[in-house]
């Protein structure tokens, strides 16, 4: 249902003759032009015309009537919901709710009544009675120029119409947007949903395995190359260390050789000293020999002189022998000393050489041992370095593998987070769309209920018109006729906005001696209760007073009970009369055991319940 189908105005202009029945054009169309009318002069059936609450006269109609709610809620001269003599009903004349000579909702007699009179409607009557009396809301020759719905009410109706149309437009637009979003969500799920994500990658498994094997082989080869490079570097370091150690060993041997050279120099110097001593002793020996020879020669020369001295002395020693003995003794001593010196020298040289050789062997053995130990240390250090390098390479490879897998895991986590965020956004969007859809659905249901209520009200009004007819509405039990929105019982004319026995909504009841109504109607007579909304017997506007006389019932919204034992009034109406039933919406029950009134109407004097927009009248009459 769109607002374009609702865009027709409630108040359309048309001319021509009246229609029949539920008529020519129908009361409910797709364009909802319910209150239009094509009435003009004359007309046959009830609730006829193109559509709306209008129609010509029927049986009781006087001169004829145009459809109500037409151009100005009126037609030619009469027409409407009910009429008595010349015309009446809900329209008449040229404007307003009154007819040319009659009008109003109902009239009890005379030329007119109800809401309009004269040539222009308003709330005043022409020659007939208004709300139960002669004048009603207005007397004289005519009333005001406006109808029952003022300009504000018309604008309100138009505004409500436009708002309803805009609501329906908005509902349709939101439904279309919702459908578009659902289609988009479905497309997204089809493209990027779990079904789209879970693709068949089985043909690529062999290629992936081959690539993985190649990656593993390349990684192993790379690691082997790195290990070879590290081993080569360690071997180079090993040779460098060996070179340094050999160089240090050579320097140590050179230092030992230099030390031995110093020892050899010392020994050579001692040998030279001993040789010098030997030469000195040889020279001394030669000097002693020379001196001895000279002394011997001197002594020999002295003995060769011619001196004869004869001395009687003891025989002397042989000096030659003594000298020879001394010479031999000295020679033996020199030889002994020389031999001792030579032996000592040789012994010292031998000892020194033995010490030098032994120390050299010890040095060589120590150097060999040191070299072996250094080689062992170097081998251990090389092995340690190789193990450390292998450990560092493996740790680096492990760290690279961890970093690579951590990066891949982080990428997967980011993808998962992005997908979760997208899913969360989609869920939130779906939730918002569901909330908006629920809200729009509730608004749509509420609007459909309101439209259904309008339909029911319209159909109820049509059924009441069809069932009761303009004639039944026009004739009361003992007096005036009961019109739409009210009815008469024992006196003046009944109906809303008019006084009667127990008028429905927008009106109050009046007894057998019905007085004039208050604002929009009032109750009086035989201890009648106070009027309903917008007036009453003694009640004020918009509030029903309590029932008077013989236990009258309390008034309801915009209405009140009246009469003896009257029931409580419903919305816009109230019960009246003895043991009157409770009033319905915009109406009420009335008269001696009357049943409860229906919407916009009520029963009277043991009659059945009134229908929508009308009510039963007369004794033993039924809706």
Swiss-Prot record:
Coiled-coil stretches noted in the UniProt entry, renumbered to this chain: none
SMART domains assigned to the protein according to its UniProt record, in alphabetical order: Filament (SM01391)
Domain IF rod span(s) in chain numbering: 153-465
Region (Coil 1A) location: 153-188
Tissue: Expressed in the terminally differentiated epidermis of palms and soles.
Span list, region Head: 1-152
Keyword Phosphoprotein among record annotations: yes
Phosphoserine, modified sites: 14, 57
Keywords: Coiled coil, Disease variant, Intermediate filament, Keratin, Palmoplantar keratoderma, Phosphoprotein
UniProt cross-references to PROSITE patterns, sorted A to Z: IF_ROD_1, IF_ROD_2
Ranges of compositional bias, category Gly residues: 14-25, 471-496
Protein name: Keratin, type I cytoskeletal 9
Residue span of region Linker 12: 300-322
């Amino acid at each position: 249902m769109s607002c374009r189908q609702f865009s027709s105005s409630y108040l359309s202009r048309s001319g021509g003759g009246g229609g029949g029945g539920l008529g020519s054009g129908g009361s409910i169309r797709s364009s909802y032009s319910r209150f239009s009318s094509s009435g003009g002069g004359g007309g046959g059936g009830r609730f006829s015309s193109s559509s709306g609450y209008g129609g010509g006269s029927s049986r009781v109609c006087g001169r004829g009537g145009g459809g109500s709610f037409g151009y100005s809620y009126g037609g030619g001269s009469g027409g409407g919901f009910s009429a008595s003599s010349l015309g009446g009903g809900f329209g008449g004349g040229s404007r307003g709710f009154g007819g040319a000579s009659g009008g109003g909702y109902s009239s009890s007699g005379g030329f007119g009544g109800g809401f309009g009179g004269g040539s222009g409607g308003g709330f005043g009557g022409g020659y007939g009675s208004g709300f139960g009396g002669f004048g009603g809301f207005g007397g004289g020759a005519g009333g005001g120029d406006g109808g029952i719905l003022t300009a504000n009410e018309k604008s309100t109706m138009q505004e409500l119409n436009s708002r309803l149309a805009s609501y329906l437009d908005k509902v349709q637009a939101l439904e279309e947007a919702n459908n578009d979003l659902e289609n988009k969500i479905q497309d997204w799920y089809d493209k990027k949903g779990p079904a789209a994500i879970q693709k068949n990658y089985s043909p690529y498994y062999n290629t992936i395995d081959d690539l993985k094997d190649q990656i593993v082989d390349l990684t192993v080869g790379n690691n082997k190359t790195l290990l070879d490079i590290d081993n080569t570097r360690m071997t180079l370091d090993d040779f460098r260390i060996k070179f340094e150690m050999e160089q240090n060993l050579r320097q140590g041997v050179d230092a030992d050789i230099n030390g031995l050279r110093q020892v050899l120099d010392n020994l050579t110097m001692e040998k030279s000293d001993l040789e010098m001593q030997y030469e000195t002793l040889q020279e001394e020996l030669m000097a002693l020999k020379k001196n001895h020879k000279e002394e011997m020669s001197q002594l020999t020369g002295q003995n060769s002189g011619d001196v004869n001295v004869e001395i009687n002395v003891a025989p002397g020693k042989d000096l030659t022998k003594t000298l020879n003995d001394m010479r031999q003794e000295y020679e033996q001593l020199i030889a002994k000393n020389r031999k001792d010196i030579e032996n000592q020298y040789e012994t010292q040289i031998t000892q020194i050489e033995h010490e030098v050789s032994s120390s050299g062997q010890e040095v060589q053995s120590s150097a060999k041992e040191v070299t072996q130990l250094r080689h062992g240390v170097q081998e251990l250090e090389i092995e340690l370095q190789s193990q450390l390098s292998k450990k560092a390479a493996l740790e680096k490879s492990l760290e690279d593998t961890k970093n690579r897998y951590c990066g891949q895991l982080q990428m997967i986590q980011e993808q998962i987070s992005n997908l979760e965020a997208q899913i969360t956004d989609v869920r939130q969007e779906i939730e918002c769309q569901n909330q908006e859809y629920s809200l729009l659905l509730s608004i749509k249901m509420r609007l459909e209920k309101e439209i259904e209520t309008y339909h029911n009200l319209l159909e109820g009004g049509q059924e009441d018109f069809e069932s009761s007819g303009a004639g039944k509405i026009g004739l009361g039990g003992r007096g005036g006729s009961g019109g739409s929105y009210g009815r008469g019982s024992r006196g003046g004319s009944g109906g809303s906005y008019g006084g009667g026995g127990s008028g429905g909504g927008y009106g109050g009841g009046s007894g057998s001696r019905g007085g004039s109504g208050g604002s929009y109607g009032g109750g009086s007579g035989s201890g009648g209760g106070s009027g309903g909304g917008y007036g009453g017997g003694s009640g004020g506007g918009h509030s029903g007073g309590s029932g008077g006389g013989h236990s009258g019932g309390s008034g309801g919204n915009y209405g009140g009970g009246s009469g003896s034992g009257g029931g409580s009034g419903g919305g816009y109406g109230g019960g009246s009369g003895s043991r009157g039933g409770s009033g319905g919406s915009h109406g009420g029950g009335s008269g001696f055991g009357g049943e409860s009134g229906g919407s916009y109407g009520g029963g009277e004097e043991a009659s059945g319940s009134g229908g929508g927009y009308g009510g039963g009248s007369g004794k033993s009459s039924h809706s």
